[in-house]
């Protein structure tokens, strides 16, 4: 009988605790566990949760990613837009009758042989690259083979159009896109993207995206990572023909954020035209009303003189924010003799401390300060396994959420999933790293439960987070644009800007 009473007593108390939980769901778990333990019922069962580092990191991101208080309402994006024809690089080279040879980089492609050598060069590194193809007829022939190839897919292309598409996925945002928009591209664009009539043209600009998977082979070559090689004969985007249309459209559209891209497309132009056009870019940006932040999205470049001009000819001081990857960051510091500029290429995963040093140098040398009339206060850096957001203190808010959101979308978009599928991604970021190599940096040990790491250096804040890398990416093109758009979407600029 006593045994029965004890069992019943325990049962009633367990039921009571359950009722408390149902009636007071907001009561902290620790309080409930203490209550359970005080009743001598043994340790409370641990709440279910993700066990893998990837699962814990994804759950931590979801808790951190919140919308900013002040949100963008109208975003204007320009000026490069095209149709991406996406297919297997190896299969296209085979269809063109090309055989595996030796890799060699070419800053401009003049022939099919140049294409094959450049593709092999970057496939061997697992690195993304973009090149201009100079011969119109040869490019047209290659583009026709690619476009009609079984399995070839047509997508919205061009940094501006891709960023516009990403923003347009948010129904509460109005998006203006200025760029060379032909019939196929117009058909592919989201209904929420408004294209001014002056941007419409009769013929599309095509870019060929040659993808390869991690471990894919071509002759003796084996790709270490999945990536893509992009090339085009794009004259409209190359001359940034839509720049003036873009700026003239802003007065009527009244955006509260402007995103500019396409400077890299000028590499196929003469030096004189590049110089002239850059000056016009600066003038156009200067015509954008004060108080509207301007984000510049960089892309793959090989012309050091053009990159140096972008840095020094008042383009950087005229923009508010930059988006770039590891190739562009290294090329930038090499072109402008910045930190670690003697490094010829990244050896595997870009060193966090080196990246941090270069970001610090850009903002210190070209960013806003008391002694410099520059608007540049933010850089969003992304590489395959981690991202860093660097900001000048006092100008931006919600950057912890912004960097996490950018990293999260890298995993979902590459895997073509709505949310992170932890079985299809892996955590490949360095488990520990130094925050600087040019000064006494801190040693950071990665914790998946606290995935965003923050550090500060002379009035500049850094937010670092790993990426959950998709093991079997469906599509790699446009990831950088999606990352930058998502980071901007969750960013908040202070009102005094």
From Swiss-Prot:
EC numbers for this chain: 2.7.1.147
A Gene Ontology cellular-component term: membrane
Example GO BP: glycolytic process through glucose-6-phosphate
ADPK domain ranges (all copies): 52-497
Cofactor(s), names only, from the UniProt record: Mg(2+)
Subcellular localization: Secreted
Gene3D superfamilies (alphabetical): 3.40.1190.20
Reaction(s) this enzyme catalyzes, per UniProt: D-glucose + ADP = D-glucose 6-phosphate + AMP + H(+)
Amino-acid positions noted as binding Mg(2+) in the UniProt annotation, renumbered to this chain: 297, 328, 481
Keyword Signal: yes
Molecular function in Gene Ontology: ADP-specific glucokinase activity; metal ion binding
Signal sequence segment: 1-22
Cofactor note: Binds 1 Mg(2+) ion per subunit.
Active-site residues per Swiss-Prot or TrEMBL entry: 481 (proton acceptor)
Keywords: Glycolysis, Kinase, Magnesium, Metal-binding, Secreted, Signal, Transferase
Source species, domain of life: Eukaryota
Pathway: Carbohydrate degradation; glycolysis
Major localisation: secreted
Pfam families for this protein: ADP_PFK_GK (PF04587)
Stated family: Belongs to the ADP-dependent glucokinase family.
Function field: Catalyzes the phosphorylation of D-glucose to D-glucose 6-phosphate using ADP as the phosphate donor. GDP and CDP can replace ADP, but with reduced efficiency.
Descriptive protein name: ADP-dependent glucokinase
Name of the gene: ADPGK
